[in-house]
């Protein structure tokens, strides 16, 4: 998920999304250990989504305003 899409969500929705990502990462790791993981790049994507969500939550905590790039 892109950062712009995540910034449109409120804190409660972001925390729910963060929980979903952690659960997905857990399941992906479990599949990897069992040898059933077919989408080998997915754990990396989920970890990056977690980092994006945590960054946005921290920005809001500190009151940092992010400029939109306009791309």
From Swiss-Prot:
A GO BP term here is:
translation
Q: What's a Pfam family in this record?
A: Ribosomal_L29
Alphabetized, the UniProt keywords read: Ribonucleoprotein, Ribosomal protein
Select a single GO molecular function from the record's annotations and give it: structural constituent of ribosome
Output the InterPro entries linked to this UniProt entry.
Answer: Ribosomal_protein_uL29, Ribosomal_uL29, Ribosomal_uL29_sf
CDD domains of this UniProt entry? Answer: Ribosomal_L29_HIP (cd00427)
Q: Which SUPFAM superfamilies match?
A: Ribosomal protein L29 (L29p)
Superkingdom in the source lineage:
Bacteria
Gene3D superfamilies reported in the protein's UniProt record: 1.10.287.310
A GO cellular component annotated for this chain's UniProt record is:
cytosolic large ribosomal subunit
Q: Which family does it belong to?
A: Belongs to the universal ribosomal protein uL29 family.
Do you know which PANTHER family this protein is assigned to? 60S RIBOSOMAL PROTEIN L35/50S RIBOSOMAL PROTEIN L29 (PTHR10916), LARGE RIBOSOMAL SUBUNIT PROTEIN UL29C (PTHR10916:SF0)
Q: What is this protein called?
A: Large ribosomal subunit protein uL29
According to its UniProt entry, this protein's organism is Roseiflexus sp. (strain RS-1)
Species lineage: Bacteria, Bacillati, Chloroflexota, Chloroflexia, Chloroflexales
């Amino acid at each position: 998920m892109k950062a712009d899409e995540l910034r449109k969500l409120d804190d409660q929705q972001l925390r729910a999304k963060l929980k979903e990502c952690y659960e997905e990462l857990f399941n992906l790791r479990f599949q990897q250990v069992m040898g059933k993981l077919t989408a080998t790049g997915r754990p990396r994507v989920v970890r990056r989504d977690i980092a994006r969500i945590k960054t946005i939550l921290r920005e809001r905590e500190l009151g940092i305003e992010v400029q939109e790039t306009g791309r």
